């Protein structure tokens, strides 16, 4: 599968989970489960971008700038959200800000990074190979209990800071 398609599909997964979390009753078991799933998918998304997609684009052209700053913005807003109890008066506002930042990040990526910006020269075959690696990595991480535990630990750390 083409790397661009993998990213777009994963953005759709993240946005869909964001919608489902937002529709679930605040502080419900359903919302907590969906939110945990979204955290795992978000971390997987950052992994495939930071470990596979961006390095491949950098190797095919010039280093990709600004991406880590965008990820940091999403993580910073996530940390704020995690520190806000769901029953707190400002929780819904924090949730909406996080979801807006996350969706804006996905939209900017699709606008600026798909297709790869000039002067990156990546062939269709390289895009297919990269996409296959990314899709395999997504499935590997989704199926890993250790990765799930690691992601929950990261969320707890963000919450505590």
Swiss-Prot record:
Gene3D superfamilies: nmb1532 protein domain like
Domain of life of the native organism: Bacteria
InterPro entries assigned to the protein according to its UniProt record, in alphabetical order: Hemerythrin-like (IPR012312)
Name recorded for this polypeptide: Uncharacterized protein Mb2666c
Species the sequence originates in: Mycobacterium bovis (strain ATCC BAA-935 / AF2122/97)
């Amino acid at each position: 599968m083409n790397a661009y398609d993998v990213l777009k599909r994963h953005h759709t997964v993240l946005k869909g989970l964001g919608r489902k979390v937002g529709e679930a009753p605040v502080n419900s078991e359903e919302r907590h489960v969906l939110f945990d799933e979204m955290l795992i998918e978000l971390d997987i998304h950052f992994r495939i971008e930071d470990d596979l997609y961006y390095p491949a684009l950098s190797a095919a052209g010039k280093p990709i700038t600004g991406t880590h700053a965008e990820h940091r913005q999403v993580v910073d807003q996530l940390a704020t959200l995690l520190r806000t109890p769901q029953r707190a008066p400002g929780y819904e506002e924090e949730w909406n800000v996080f979801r807006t930042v996350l969706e804006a990040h996905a939209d900017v990526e699709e606008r600026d990074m798909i297709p790869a910006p000039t002067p990156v020269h990546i062939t269709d075959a390289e895009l297919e190979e990269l996409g296959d690696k990314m899709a395999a990595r997504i499935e590997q991480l989704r199926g890993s209990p250790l990765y799930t535990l690691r992601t929950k630990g990261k969320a707890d750390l963000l919450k505590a800071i």
